[in-house]
Amino acid sequence: MTNLLKKFNEQQMQVLAKEVPEFRPGDDLKVTFKVVDSTSERIQIFEGVCISKRNRGLHSSFAVRKVSHGESIVSQFFIYSPALVSVQVTRRGKVRRAKLYYLCKLFGKAARIKERATYKNNKSN
């Protein structure tokens, strides 16, 4: 029974596969997704800090936090959801935790995250 479920999940992951960049908690993300109203469908952009990432195969998801009008908004996105259009990493953050839920209580300068340095591999032998 579990083999059938694993095979089904793997098939669905191949069908729903997308170009999702490598990102970690602490990174600033720009998530584009479809919003379906009763009569129309539109694309919306949610930009904020990734506060958690959950790798569970077909059920993989991540949470993004943004501050809008002084209120903290956390939104959960499934990586293999057909509603998810694209994910872009705008800035890499340097953190020491896998889950950054403590950021939900912080605002302004207290909620800042240091930028992670990225180096290019120079192999000029």
Swiss-Prot record:
Any Pfam family hit: Ribosomal_L19
Gene Ontology cellular component terms for the protein in this record: cytosolic large ribosomal subunit
Domain of life: Bacteria
The keyword Ribonucleoprotein is annotated on this UniProt entry: yes
Keyword flag Ribosomal protein: yes
Gene Ontology MF term list: structural constituent of ribosome
InterPro entries from the UniProt entry: Ribosomal_bL19, Ribosomal_bL19_sf, Translation_prot_SH3-like_sf
Keywords: Ribonucleoprotein, Ribosomal protein
Gene3D superfamilies named among the record's database cross-references: 2.30.30.790
GO biological process terms on file: translation
Function according to Swiss-Prot or TrEMBL: This protein is located at the 30S-50S ribosomal subunit interface and may play a role in the structure and function of the aminoacyl-tRNA binding site.
Family: Belongs to the bacterial ribosomal protein bL19 family.
HAMAP family reported for this sequence: Ribosomal_bL19 (MF_00402)
Name of the protein described by the UniProt record: Large ribosomal subunit protein bL19
Species of the source: Wolbachia sp. subsp. Brugia malayi (strain TRS)
Lineage: Bacteria, Pseudomonadati, Pseudomonadota, Alphaproteobacteria, Rickettsiales
